[in-house]
């Protein structure tokens, strides 16, 4: 008697693929003169949601989508709450266009803040970086990799503190001797470990922004 051993067909396995929602779009334009970049800024005006950056003939046009802008706005709310709890004045300057004709560099951060130098710009409607100080703090939300080097732009403009949030991790950089170094604590906010801010963004998705902001204020008080 001959016994045939038949191999049973393997069951098809379901493969789950996690899709990451698009948070922003980035367009790169090359071989653009500084004069053309300035003309683009003038033509596009201020009533837009795109953010532009320029370095060495390259223009990046970033358009924020919901995840990007939601993170940006909520972090801004927490920064303002921090200032209030610490007794710091703050002038929110938003996506202020930061350009220096003499340097040929420019950028528009997601958010920017005058804190240490707030009194110097308190009543100003326009900022001229050849006369006025740059923002003390800028925030860039970067779910995708920028196509221009923001370090070079903000180093040239001499922004003292630079925050980068990639959707998961918040990194803090401070300017010293012409270059940025990553630090654990923000010099602006002292002992408050602001690198923990991302967990409050996650909490807000479950508990709501107002409830999370109240919890954040209580958390900050524990470090004052």
Indicate where each model-derived feature is located:
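Gly/Pro/Ser/Thr-rich low-complexity, intrinsically disordered segments predominantly at protein N-termini
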Residues: 2-160, 164-224
């Amino acid at each position: 008697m001959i016994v045939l051993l038949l191999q049973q067909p393997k069951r098809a396995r379901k493969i789950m693929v996690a899709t990451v929602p698009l948070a922003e779009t980035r367009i790169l334009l090359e071989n653009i003169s500084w004069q053309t970049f300035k003309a683009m800024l003038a033509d596009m005006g201020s009533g837009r949601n795109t953010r532009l950056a320029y370095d060495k003939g390259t223009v990046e046009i970033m358009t924020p989508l919901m995840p990007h802008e939601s993170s940006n706005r909520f972090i801004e709310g927490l920064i303002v709450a921090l200032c209030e709890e610490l007794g710091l004045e703050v002038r929110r300057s938003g996506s202020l266009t930061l350009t220096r004709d003499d340097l040929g560099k420019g950028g528009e951060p997601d958010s920017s803040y005058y804190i240490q130098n707030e009194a110097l710009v308190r009543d100003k409607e326009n900022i001229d970086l050849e006369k006025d100080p740059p923002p003390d703090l800028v925030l860039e939300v970067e779910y995708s990799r920028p196509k221009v080097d923001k370090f070079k732009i903000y180093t040239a403009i001499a922004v003292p503190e630079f925050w980068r949030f990639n959707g998961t991790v918040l990194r803090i950089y401070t300017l010293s001797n012409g270059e940025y170094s990553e630090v654990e604590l923000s010099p602006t906010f002292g002992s408050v470990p602001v690198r923990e801010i991302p967990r409050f963004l996650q909490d807000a998705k479950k508990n709501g922004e107002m409830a999370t902001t109240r919890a954040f204020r209580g958390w900050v008080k524990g470090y004052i």
